Amino acid sequence: THVKELVEQNHQKYESYGVTAGIYSAGLKLKETQHQVTFASIQSAARNLDDFDKPYSLIIIDECHRVNLANPDLSRSSSNEQSQKRAKNITKGSTENKLNADSQELSQQNENKQSNSNQYQQIIKKLMQVNPEVKLLGLTATPYRLGMGWIYKKHYRGFIRSEEKRPFEHCIYELPLRYLIKREYLTEPNVVDATIEHYDFSSLRSNASGEYSPTDMNHLLNKNPRVTQGIIEQVIELGEKRQGIMIFAATVEHAKEVFSYLPANLSALITGAIDNTERDKLIKAFKRKEIKYLVNVSVLTTGFDAPHVDMIAILRPTQSVSLYQQIVGRGLRLSENKKDCLVMDYTGND
């Protein structure tokens, strides 16, 4: 997977069933390959391909909707191209400085996505060289990408999702959110569109990924400073009896403004610029409920596991259904004394 938090969470859950596995992640200071199963950070694995010289039978990619495995630039020898055809691809169901900070963060996020795709291709190529019969399994709660649609071609119930090239061939199993919520495997979301204070991003143009320019968003947000203050006042009021509140801001500048209106002793701000040590410290404090409000910009949308979160405030626009579901999903984990998750959308996301 793409972040060390997910590597650690997945490893802990796997070993809770009484089995053992290794971890290969520089961020977790472990590089173990002697076990039958290895939970790896894609960045660490791709930088140390020679460490993966044993024949693995299965590659599992968590959050596989993030990865563009259909990249035509991936070069293989003719034997590897034949092996790739045999391998089954399957999936489970302001100031200039402030503007530069946001632009740099967006640029870094885009570079990371492209880099991750290339790194996944590198490790897949390496493992296929060792074992041409290795299989590929993708796991995701959101099997689609904006601009692409479904990331697989065929559903196991017989219908065709796409005739075009896709990262995965078949969906072999699907477990809808509605089913999990109805049977109380997940918490019921209570989604509310804010009617008093809200942002209007309708004049902005999104890119192919459904995201908006930080410069454009900052320009719009700076025209309405009272709106943000009013929104946070409502978040504090509605969240009085809530255990953990996550706030998703539009830009770094916006996140800092949001943070300034929250109780300082109960709040934390996480952006892509924060160092790993401080980030880990703040996340642990939030999970221990020492911090009630956690403001972030595009860094805690995937795989972040804090079951006590029972309120989500969305202050960023997106046209990506996948991203929206990932954001809401941060509040759907079951937890003690948690009856539902209040989701406040202040941006009019459809």
Each language-model region and where it sits:
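A short beta-strand element within the Helicase C-terminal
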Residues: 295, 302-317, 341-345
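Conserved segment of the helicase C-terminal RecA-like domain
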Residues: 331-350
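Conserved Walker A/P-loop ATP-binding site and its immediately adjacent core
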Residues: 1-13
